[in-house]
């Protein structure tokens, strides 16, 4: 059966949304919103969307036939059947107000994702860290096994050139967002939880027990024949496991894990390990990603694929040939500075645990390099809530260039800004950080800071990602020695 025939068969089994033809996204340029819009436009729906600026997501959607509107205005929703919003959108947005006045249904992003998943075999990946990488690895394994899944990911899957794709099979592999508890809308067949830590606590009223209970509720959205795939190395996951009334498959480095990694080693950007599973032969894996945290992400993909009887050869090949995800330990090149050659890596991690995992991966893969990090804190509330953890983790690099907080719409919080964090790290006495008041000042500092052989990392979830690309395009007047990846 050809892919066209397979897709026609799939569509015959999935009812169209009754009377819904024209779908409008408010904030369509976000990765999550844009991914769902891409799947829907490829399914044949008329897609429009608004955002405050053009970006790579909106450009791709426009090339696929979506109508992109820059700016938010009431008339944008006058001819649509449903409006999709994310929690980042202000309720006073003129398009939201107009939709309410016109009695047009307004649904959250996760509700639309749940609708896509309703008649498919859904695999939903949740957790504080590692969701994007794990989702990408699972999608890659299923693609290698010719399962041709639909996927919606929170980052760019390099091999696909996009973060979302409409497949021809019954599978939908999607990142599940706990930041606003909207993942409770999803009803997958398989749920993955990578880990659970305190983050986005404003959603949960500062109550960590409420956050844990919400993850339990998410797993109980599984049908009685579904499966929860969980990282047993995580302390909080071990704590909630007795509360899970579904089949559980565990993974990790722990000997208790159903899917266990042994013999881990790292060589530069690659990790190698052997996977042990009950009732199956051991398999040697080479993963084209660095760090123990990425081995855990790969174990989740192996566990999901093994439950679905995907052949080990597809798993081995997909992990070995994995091309990575945008802004996840992304190697941007080798640059010739006035003081010598410097390696540039960009990473999205913005929680202390994520930053620590990145530091460990850098140390393990390039032990002889001095580690220089330009870090941009993300959100005042996160900086406040995890302040001491940030001080501890950021003190572990060799040289720190600390930018001010990327607000992400939040009002400043006294004592939780970049200057305060810089002072606290300096008082710790391990390193003497350099405060960078504005991102556009970073390039001017680098010639005096970088040394031959350094590993220079740009780290954070704000606009430092765009800044790293500018640096990679010779914003310092540096010559790229290795082609950008």
From Swiss-Prot:
Record key words, sorted: ATP-binding, Cell cycle, Cell division, Cell shape, Cell wall biogenesis/degradation, Cytoplasm, Ligase, Nucleotide-binding, Peptidoglycan synthesis
Pfam name, any one: Mur_ligase_M
BP GO terms, sorted: cell division; cell wall organization; peptidoglycan biosynthetic process; regulation of cell shape
Catalysed reactions, semicolon-separated: UDP-N-acetyl-alpha-D-muramate + L-alanine + ATP = UDP-N-acetyl-alpha-D-muramoyl-L-alanine + ADP + phosphate + H(+)
Alphabetized InterPro entries for the sequence: Mur-like_cat_sf, Mur_ligase_C, Mur_ligase_C_dom_sf, Mur_ligase_cen, Mur_ligase_N, MurCDEF_pg_biosynth, UDP-N-AcMur_Ala_ligase_MurC
Gene Ontology molecular function: any one: UDP-N-acetylmuramate-L-alanine ligase activity
GO annotations of cellular component type: cytoplasm
Pathway(s) where this gene product acts: Cell wall biogenesis; peptidoglycan biosynthesis
EC number: 6.3.2.8
Function: Cell wall formation.
Family, as annotated: Belongs to the MurCDEF family.
Name of protein: UDP-N-acetylmuramate--L-alanine ligase
Gene source species: Shewanella frigidimarina (strain NCIMB 400)
Primary gene name: murC
């Amino acid at each position: 059966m050809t892919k066209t025939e397979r897709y026609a068969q799939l569509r015959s089994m999935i009812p169209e949304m009754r009377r819904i033809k024209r779908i409008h996204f408010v904030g369509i340029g976000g990765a999550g919103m844009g991914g769902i819009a891409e799947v829907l436009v490829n399914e044949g729906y008329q897609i429009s969307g608004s955002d405050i600026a053009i970006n790579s997501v909106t450009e791709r959607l426009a090339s696929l036939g979506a109508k992109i509107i820059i700016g938010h205005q009431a008339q944008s929703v006058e001819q649509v059947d449903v409006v999709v919003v994310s929690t980042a959108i202000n309720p006073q947005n003129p398009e939201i107000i107009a939709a309410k006045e016109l009695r047009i249904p307004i649904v959250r992003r996760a509700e639309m994702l749940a609708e896509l998943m309703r008649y498919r075999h859904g695999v939903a990946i949740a957790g504080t860290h590692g969701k994007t990488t794990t989702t990408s690895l699972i999608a890659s394994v299923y693609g290698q096994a010719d399962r041709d899944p639909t996927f919606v990911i929170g980052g760019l899957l390099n091999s696909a050139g996009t973060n979302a794709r409409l497949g021809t099979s019954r599978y939908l592999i999607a990142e599940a967002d706990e930041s606003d508890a909207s993942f409770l809308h999803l009803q997958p067949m398989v749920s993955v939880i990578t880990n659970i830590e305190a983050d986005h606590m404003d959603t949960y009223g500062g109550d960590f027990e409420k956050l844990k209970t919400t993850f339990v509720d998410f797993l109980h959205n599984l049908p009685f024949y579904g499966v929860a795939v969980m990282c047993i190395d995580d302390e909080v996951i071990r704590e909630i496991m007795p509360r899970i009334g579904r089949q559980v498959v565990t993974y990790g480095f722990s000997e208790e894990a159903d899917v266990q990694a042994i013999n881990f080693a790292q060589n530069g950007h690659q990790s190698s390990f052997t996977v042990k599973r009950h009732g199956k032969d051991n398999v040697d894996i080479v993963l084209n990603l660095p760090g123990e945290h990425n081995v855990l992400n790969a174990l989740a993909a192996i566990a999901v694929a093994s439950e679905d009887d995907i052949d080990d050869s597809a798993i081995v090949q997909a992990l070995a040939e994995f091309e990575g995800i945008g802004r996840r330990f992304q190697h941007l090149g080798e640059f010739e500075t006035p003081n010598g050659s410097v390696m540039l890596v960009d990473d999205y991690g913005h929680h202390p645990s994520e930053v620590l995992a990145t530091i460990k991966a850098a140390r393990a893969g390039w032990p002889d390099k001095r580690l220089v990090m330009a870090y941009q804190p993300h959100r005042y509330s996160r900086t406040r809530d995890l302040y001491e953890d940030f001080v501890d983790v950021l003190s572990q690099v060799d040289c720190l260039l600390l930018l001010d907080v990327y607000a992400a719409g939040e009002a400043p919080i006294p004592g939780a800004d970049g200057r305060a964090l810089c002072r606290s790290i300096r008082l710790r006495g391990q390193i003497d950080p350099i405060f960078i008041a504005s991102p556009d000042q970073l390039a001017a500092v680098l010639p005096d800071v970088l040394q031959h052989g350094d590993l220079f990392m740009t780290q954070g979830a704000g606009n430092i990602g765009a800044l790293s690309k500018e640096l990679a395009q010779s914003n310092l007047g540096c010559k790229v020695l290795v082609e950008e990846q």
